[in-house]
């Protein structure tokens, strides 16, 4: 089993510029940086996880293409959260007016903004506690709606800003609720 590697030796010693250089020089590797300065090296997902992630991204992208309410990002996109962590959700979405407030320079880097919506897809390489902690961090940083999807268990944890986490089993679809009107994500290809 390939696992995510946390490199604690760099805690509080890597600058934003160094992190950006590291990512640019290692485009085939996905990195995140915790708010404590811990560098996380993430292994690529397997083909099935990649397919599932692509399906989720495609459904969000298609809905957004029709509604034009925001901007959709895939898992290669990094954001600098308000707590200074640099995170890359599997799928994310930002309300257009919030994205438009950022400068071109900010948009070209790890944009200093928490997405309004995130999806994390639990892959065999992930530690559940790490991904749940990341979802809690997203909430604390202002993410309004988040889905943690466990394909093997046909389970979804829904994280809503200011509310308790809701756990749902055997769903056929998920709703974007008030945040993303008329969004319905079909989970049958994921489960």
Residue ranges, per PLM feature:
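Gly/Pro/Ser/Thr-rich low-complexity, intrinsically disordered segments predominantly at protein N-termini
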Residues: 1-191
């Amino acid at each position: 089993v390939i696992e995510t590697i946390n490199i604690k030796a760099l805690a509080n010693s890597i600058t934003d510029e160094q992190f950006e250089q590291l990512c640019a020089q290692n485009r085939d590797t996905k990195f995140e940086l915790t708010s404590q300065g811990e560098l996380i090296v993430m292994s690529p997902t397997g083909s099935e996880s990649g397919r599932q992630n692509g399906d989720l991204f495609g459904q969000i992208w298609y809905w957004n293409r029709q509604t034009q309410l925001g901007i959709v990002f895939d898992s290669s996109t990094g954001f600098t959260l308000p707590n200074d962590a640099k995170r890359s959700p599997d799928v994310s979405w930002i309300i257009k007016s919030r994205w438009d407030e950022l400068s071109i320079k900010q948009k070209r880097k790890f944009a200093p903004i928490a997405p309004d919506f995130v999806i994390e897809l639990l892959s065999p390489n992930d530690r559940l506690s790490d991904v749940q902690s990341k979802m809690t961090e997203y909430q604390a940083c202002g993410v309004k709606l988040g889905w943690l999807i466990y394909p093997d268990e046909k389970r979804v944890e829904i994280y809503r800003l200011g509310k308790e986490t809701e756990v749902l089993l055997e769903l056929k679809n998920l709703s974007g609720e008030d945040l993303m009107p008329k969004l319905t994500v079909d989970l049958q290809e994921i489960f």
